[in-house]
Swiss-Prot record:
Name of the protein in question: Large ribosomal subunit protein eL31
Keyword Ribonucleoprotein: yes
Pfam families, sorted: Ribosomal_L31e
Similarity annotation: Belongs to the eukaryotic ribosomal protein eL31 family.
Top-rank taxon, per record: Archaea
Gene: rpl31e
Record flagged with keyword Ribosomal protein: yes
One BP term from GO: translation
CDD domains (alphabetical): Ribosomal_L31e
Length: 88
């Protein structure tokens, strides 16, 4: 099986909207970590501050519904998650 070093994926935050409104950002960040750990077998997941800022650009309780992320392997079982930008 081919190693996943660079990968783009879309993460849907539908489950982050369940529960209290002021916990949405925390749940969304935790969802990103859990999804990357599950798909790549990562032990350490580093989230880019620009990605966290783009999730909450409307405020802490009004997060975006979906986000496209780029996952890059930077070490042994260590992954960096960044915001994937469209190239035109």
């Amino acid at each position: 099986m081919k190693e996943k070093d660079n990968f783009e994926m879309v993460i849907n935050f539908k489950r982050a909207f369940m529960g209290r409104r002021n916990q949405r950002t925390k749940r969304a960040i935790k969802m990103i970590r859990n999804i990357v750990q599950r798909h790549f077998g990562a032990e350490k997941v580093i989230i880019d501050p620009l990605l966290a800022k783009s999730i909450t650009y409307n405020g802490r309780d009004k997060i975006v519904r979906k986000v496209r992320v780029a996952v890059k392997k930077i070490g042994e079982k260590t992954y960096l998650v960044r915001l994937a930008l469209k190239s035109e």
